[in-house]
Curated annotation (Swiss-Prot):
Organism annotation: Mus musculus (Mouse)
An annotated GO BP: blastocyst hatching
Disulfide bonds: none
Annotated InterPro entries: ABM_dom, Dimeric_a/b-barrel, EF-hand-dom_pair, EF_Hand_1_Ca_BS, EF_hand_dom, NECAB1/2/3
Parts forming coiled coils: 135-163, 209-275
Name recorded for this polypeptide: N-terminal EF-hand calcium-binding protein 1
Stretches assigned to the EF-hand domain: 26-61, 60-95
Binding, Ca(2+): D39, N41, D43, K45, E50
Compositional bias ranges of the Polar residues kind: 190-202
Swiss-Prot/TrEMBL keywords: Calcium, Coiled coil, Cytoplasm, Metal-binding, Phosphoprotein, Repeat
Length: 352
């Protein structure tokens, strides 16, 4: 299915110029894709803020990211283009040069196979359809197995780096202001052929809590956050809560607001489903609740964690990073996240 969304002439010209002027070696086309995804204002180059939003990994500090940016910026323009990205990373690929080349071939082969499947599947015999479904499933299993191995390698290398760093500086907190809504230009998606699987339903009991008492508490916390932001709250405690020495006095509440583009809503819902399933399985996660605002593609996600340390460890997990990375494409504007500590007694009271 062709993408009917309009793209700006400058974006098309920029892509054509890059393809024609750059003689990319095998496997380096990934950097064209990186530039398209990270370039939020579609000017064909990356500012430092765009670079930071895409490349920050939670290990390098802001100063280190800034130093890396200027190392790559050999043209000294305070912007990065595809040529500079390719020139820098091509010097450090090692064995991954072969990996990227193989991925490029694999991507083309899969797209070709899926295109033929889309064309021939409907008219195929029952046996041929079975074989097609089987091959799709087994191909997916093989790719997922490779993904699991890569995720283990990522976790190991990141943990090793953290342990080796003496007096680690505070990881860079991502914060980038995008002007208005996202540009309509997207990375070209090859997902026109997909199985008719049941659509992810955010109103399912596992994800959208309809318990009135619970939602009342969430609304109460929302009002409290709003009042705190207005700075007109006068704290006059009517009751003093006595906390025992070994009792954990607070838990962490995380509120996340996400405005999703209409065309990416289904993919976002699937990514959100996987994220919630993974996060909910963590021992420090007390509860996750989701609200979708009516008549809007805006989601409010409330996460309750045992403490801030558990929450910070959660942010470094692969499933959390995968969800954040996918949101680069799915969200119209940057995600808004706010955190606050709430009395642990509230949680105990509402779960007894």
């Amino acid at each position: 299915m062709e993408d009917s969304r309009e793209t700006s002439p400058s974006s098309n010209n920029s892509s054509e110029e890059l393809s024609s002027t750059l003689q990319l070696s095998k496997g380096m086309s990934i950097f064209l894709d990186i530039l398209r995804r990270a370039d939020k204002n579609d000017d064909g180059k990356l500012s430092f803020e765009e670079f930071k939003a895409y490349f920050a990994d939670g290990v390098l500090s802001g100063e280190e990211l800034h130093e890396l940016f200027h190392t790559i910026d050999t043209h000294n323009t305070n912007n990065l283009d595809t040529e500079e990205l390719c020139e820098y990373f091509s010097q450090h690929l090692g064995e991954y040069e072969n990996v990227l080349a193989a991925l490029e071939d694999l991507n083309l082969s899969i797209l070709k196979a899926m295109g033929k499947t889309k064309k021939d599947y409907q008219e195929a015999s029952n046996l041929e359809q079975f074989v097609t479904r089987f091959l799709l499933k087994e191909t997916l299993n093989q790719l997922q197995s490779l993904q699991n191995s890569l995720e283990c390698a990522m976790e190991t290398t990141e943990e090793q780096t953290r342990q080796e760093r003496q007096g680690p500086s505070k990881p860079e907190v991502l914060s980038i202001q995008w002007p208005g809504k996202r540009s309509s230009r997207r990375v070209q998606r090859h997902n026109s052929f997909s199985p008719n699987s049941p659509q992810f339903n955010v109103s399912s009991p596992a994800l959208l809590e309809e318990d009135n008492q619970w939602m009342t508490q969430i609304n109460r916390l929302q009002k409290l956050i709003d009042r705190l932001e207005k700075k007109d709250l006068k704290l006059e405690p009517l009751e003093e809560e006595i906390i025992e020495e070994n009792t954990k006095p607070h838990i962490m509440l995380v509120q996340r607001q996400m405005s999703v583009t209409e065309e990416d809503l289904e993919e976002f819902q699937l990514a959100l489903k996987h994220y919630v399933e993974s996060a909910s399985a963590q021992s420090g996660c007390l509860r996750i609740s989701i609200q979708k605002l009516s008549n809007e593609s805006r989601y409010m996600i409330y996460e309750f964690w045992e403490n801030s340390s558990v929450w910070n460890r959660h942010l470094q997990t692969n499933y959390s990073k995968t969800f954040q990375r996918s949101n680069v494409d799915f969200l119209e504007t940057p995600e808004l996240t706010s955190t606050m500590l709430v009395p642990a007694s509230w949680w105990i009271l509402n779960n007894n």
